[in-house]
């Protein structure tokens, strides 16, 4: 099969798969909204500042398959890509990040597939966030489909830093000297980390 696109048969299967990923994303999102609401009512505390949801675009999915030198098939997406559906949970404080993540992880109808804690172990460029991949059941007429959703938990300050770092890295009109500031970015990241203890 051509590695650049889906066959006509797989295109229909791909559209159906994306509907399942969207359902999984909304399932996790609803669980998070319920947890946030409970915290507001019971504890007068709003741990989630806001959430952002997204499904990877077709081009992003195809690009990731190519970078990983994987075949462009629906099976390859199901077996190898765990971030097609994603939610970013922006919390007020670092303690909120872990509390919300732990309460969500404890729910008995979802499974934790993978955890990468870039808060305790930041990336070399200073990036901090807690990434958890969950498998959540999506109930369709054909039955339950356990589907992965990547949830990135971070504080407002960590989110601001990640946005700034992303803009600096991918902004094309910056001189090379501006792009080569990893030490400065790590220092900013550490300062942001200390702000929201």
Protein language model annotation of sequence segments:
Residues 68, 84, 94-97:
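Surface-exposed peri-terminal alpha-helical interaction modules
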Residues 182-197:
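Positively charged, low-complexity/disordered segments
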């Amino acid at each position: 099969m051509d590695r650049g696109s889906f066959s006509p048969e797989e295109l229909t299967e791909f559209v159906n798969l994306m509907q399942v990923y969207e359902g999984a994303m909304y399932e996790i999102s609803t669980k998070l909204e319920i947890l946030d609401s409970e915290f507001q009512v019971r504890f007068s505390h709003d741990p989630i500042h806001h959430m952002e949801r997204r499904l990877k675009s077709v081009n992003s999915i195809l690009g990731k398959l190519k970078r990983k030198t994987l075949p462009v098939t629906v099976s390859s997406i199901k077996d190898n890509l765990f971030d097609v559906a994603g939610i970013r949970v922006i919390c007020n404080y670092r303690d909120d990040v872990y509390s919300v993540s732990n309460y969500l992880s404890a729910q008995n109808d979802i499974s934790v597939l993978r955890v990468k804690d870039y808060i305790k172990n930041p990336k070399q460029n200073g990036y901090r966030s807690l990434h958890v991949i969950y498998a959540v059941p999506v109930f369709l007429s054909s039955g339950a489909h356990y589907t992965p959703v990547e949830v990135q938990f971070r504080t407002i300050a960590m989110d601001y830093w990640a946005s700034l770092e992303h803009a600096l890295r991918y902004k094309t009109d910056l001189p090379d000297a501006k792009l080569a500031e990893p030490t400065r970015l790590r220092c900013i990241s550490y300062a942001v980390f200390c702000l929201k203890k």
